[in-house]
């Protein structure tokens, strides 16, 4: 989660918490209701705010490619680790393998039957 998403979530939580604390009647009505009943909030309100928060978190996630798609070890072959530049590409890459290459090469007959 990047900083913009975290800031948006924090602002959203503060707005939700502030709306629950003040309510539609303001602070005077809140004091009266606090004197009348000092019971905790019913579990339905907690579930509603939790489900709302869960929905908002899912909505904030950007649909895109999974992390498994971005990690592609097969792109450079199996069990390749370290720097491939030193192993495969060198200034004189063809000279060391010359004898091996020509021993495996078979003559090609282009166009002759």
From Swiss-Prot:
GO terms for biological process: acute inflammatory response to antigenic stimulus; chemical synaptic transmission; excitatory postsynaptic potential; maternal process involved in female pregnancy; negative regulation of appetite; negative regulation of heart rate; negative regulation of insulin secretion; neuropeptide signaling pathway. Residues 1-20 form the signal peptide. Residues 22-48 are annotated as: Disordered. Residues 21-65, 79-92 form a propeptide. It holds the Pfam family NPFF. Its main location: secreted. The modification Phenylalanine amide is found at residues 76, 110. One of its GO terms (cellular component) is dendrite. Keywords: Amidation, Cleavage on pair of basic residues, Neuropeptide, Secreted, Signal. It is found in: Secreted. One of its GO terms (molecular function) is neuropeptide activity. Morphine modulating peptides. Have wide-ranging physiologic effects, including the modulation of morphine-induced analgesia, elevation of arterial blood pressure, and increased somatostatin secretion from the pancreas. Neuropeptide FF potentiates and sensitizes ASIC1 and ASIC3 channels. Belongs to the FARP (FMRFamide related peptide) family. This is Pro-FMRFamide-related neuropeptide FF.
């Amino acid at each position: 989660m990047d900083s913009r998403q975290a800031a948006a979530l924090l602002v959203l939580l503060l707005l939700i918490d502030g709306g629950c604390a003040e309510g539609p009647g303001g602070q005077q009505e809140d004091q009266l209701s606090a004197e009348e009943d000092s019971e905790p909030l019913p579990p339905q309100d907690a579930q509603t705010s939790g489900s709302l928060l869960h929905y908002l978190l899912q909505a904030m996630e950007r649909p895109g490619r999974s992390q498994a798609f971005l990690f592609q070890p097969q792109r450079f072959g199996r069990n390749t680790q370290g720097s491939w530049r030193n192993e495969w590409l060198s200034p004189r890459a063809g000279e060391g393998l010359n004898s091996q290459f020509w021993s495996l090469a078979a003559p090609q007959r282009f166009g002759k039957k």
